[in-house]
Amino acid sequence: MIYPQIMHKPALPWVFRRPTQEDGLSIHELIAQCAPLDQNSAYCNFLQSSHFQTTCLMAEQQELLVGFVSAYRKPEQQNELFIWQVAVHPSARGKGLAYQMLKHLLAREDLADITVLETTITRSNQASWRLFQKLDREQGEQGSVSTFLDETCHFEGEHDTEYLYRIPLQSSN
């Protein structure tokens, strides 16, 4: 007799935590596996995991890095959080991890004063559009989209247009 509940064990839960400087290279390797995200230098990922620990988040499963959110407070608008990248390992996609990472990040006590979330997305990145549209719906559908960096004007045709998605957050994230 086959016992399906034994054959298909549920996945272990994700563990969310702040990155440390020691995580920089693992983050760099994760992002390399997460097309269509732009690969930044390993140095950049070390800075994200050390200088921006309070606004970045890692997700691990069985002590393996499966997700990372890089974000920062905008220098001139400290109550606005800019989400730079949301990376999910191919093995963890389609399970709601990206959304859970954003929710855990926004639930941090030291980010309780964040009133606006921003990100940029290229037209072709459908996974990111779905993710941020879901968050926008949850927050009352007050989000707006505008051109941030134009393919022709800013990138001379070398990169797709980046659209700025701005989502006002309700007081209880």
Swiss-Prot record:
Give the matching Gene3D superfamilies.
Answer: 3.40.630.30
Specify the N-acetyltransferase domain's residue ranges: 14-170
One GO MF annotation is: acyltransferase activity, transferring groups other than amino-acyl groups
> One Pfam annotation, family name?
Acetyltransf_1
Q: Which NCBIfam families match?
A: ectoine_EctA
Provide the family line.
Belongs to the acetyltransferase family. EctA subfamily.
Name of this protein: L-2,4-diaminobutyric acid acetyltransferase
Q: Which organism is it from?
A: Vibrio cholerae serotype O1 (strain ATCC 39315 / El Tor Inaba N16961)
Phylogenetic placement of the source organism: Bacteria, Pseudomonadati, Pseudomonadota, Gammaproteobacteria, Vibrionales
